[in-house]
Amino acid sequence: MNPAPRVVFAASTVLYLVTGTFLTAGRADLMGDALSRVSATQSAVFSRDPHLSAIGFVFTPLTSLAQLPFVAFSQWFPGITRWGLSGVVMTALFMAGAVTMVWGIGVDRGAPHWLCVLITAVFALNPMVVFYGGNGMSEALFLFCCCWAVRRLMRWVRTDGVHDLVAAGIALGLGYLTRYDALAPAMAAGVLVFGFSYRRRTTQRTAGAVMDFALLIAPVALAFVVWAATSWLITGQAFQQFTSQYGNSAILQQSGAGEPDHPLEAAQYSIGAMLILAPILPLLLPVAAALAVRRRDRQPAVPILLFGAVLAFQTLTYVTGSTFAFLRFYIAAIPLTAILALTLVPERGFPASKRLGKYADVPGESASESDSGRRDPGHAHGGLTGSGTPRAAVTVAAVLVSVLLIGSLPVTGLGMNSQLMAVQEYPLRAVLFPDPDNVSDKYADAARIAATFSTERKLANYLDALDLPPGSIVMDTVYGFAVLVASDRPDRFVIPSDSDFVRNLNRPVERGVKYILAVPNTGRGTSDAINRRYPTMYENGAQIATLELEIPNDGAGQPDWRLYRVIGS
């Protein structure tokens, strides 16, 4: 067995683990969405009322479920949850998997070894890939699923193998359980498979194309139905992302976001984000497409359609006001560029396959003669490629694109430092290069963002020091997730996922509740269950509690906390 994929995976994993651990545990740089996933996973294992559905149904479950094996050790190593290290491990493994898939695509096409190494390294070392390969966010898992699906479909275009088609469907199904926007590449893949299957068949075209389409889409449909049905059975809402008080639609409304006044400006942001992440994509895309048409190479259509669907979906949702202006939403442009660079060199030979389909595209021999998966020498003859293009010209083009790819890395790094384009990434400069003497507004904002959740950790330490019995503190996790993961005793908190949360909230004295953690009843705080039950809790204790402590917040976008003591407790 070729050890190269294992080496690529191991090296990438170590890189992302070290980087992620340094940023989180070393520099306290924590992403809110990542930490909330850790909190949800912890609640499923170590809350007062541990159960799997505590991970919630607002967001897709796979990012949290993948962390369960690591969170299980947090009672012995609290830093796993306190610093979100379970998310770091999860993202490191899956981003390394995405890197390995890019390597595998080059190998499957028979690309020169130097090109495989260079393109894989450029992808793995992209600043956005490194950052999101170790911060616990869903991007790593989503990219892995997309790259896996792209690789398998690129193989299927050649092999017509059912194994490749089913694997691509599984990858897309898992992608949906990672991010809802995986439906976009799934739909694009369905159209692609139906069209390719219909065109290359000589008999029973429609029936065969429908069968191939069903094999691909079945795992996605199963994931969609099972997740929606489970959510409906447990919560009464099939799509909490859109209907829940905690869902994305509610978050947009509570945050004051809406449809942009000028859709053209919103589209310009999306284009700018893609150019930051993939500066050479406008050059590479038409060149790769033209070469594919000239060679009659159908493989480049796969990454163009699938990753293009992701980017188009993100652009559309931002233009219509359904999402935020986050640079990370356009990260699919990075693997798209890397894979297109690999397709500049014509494919050589044939990918190893366990079982070829009837319509396998094997150059120079029949499918039965190639069932062993051995490689054919390819289409190259003399100094020409299969398209008649001089081999030297293709090599020069690949070298030039590789140089441009390397040169694009600092462009992405500089773009990540833009306060306008990269609102979640630009604080990295303050994290990596602290400068107390810098008095600029930009640095002050970056430092405040970098300090996010520091107050919640101090609050958790204070509450731990009180040595309260289980179930003593009622708190919603809208903002409180950061307090929960930082506490050594999460069972002291009564949270919405607990089956008796409403009873404790309605009768705190009878249920042994001693404290209530309150946030302002404004912005996202309007969705806080405590504010919905007691609208004046933050202002005056709602006549059931007295103010014990007020905690001003050092972090950006975080509320000033108030700790109330329940009267009669």
Where are these regions (language model features)?
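Hydrophobic, aromatic-rich transmembrane alpha-helices
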Residues: 2, 200, 272-304
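Membrane-lumen/periplasm interface segments of specific transmembrane helices
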Residues: 19, 195, 199, 209-286, ...
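Transmembrane alpha-helix segments characteristic
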Residues: 10-15, 117-118, 123, 221, ...
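Signature aromatic-anchored transmembrane alpha helix within multi-pass, membrane-resident enzymes
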Residues: 6-10, 191, 217-221, 296, ...
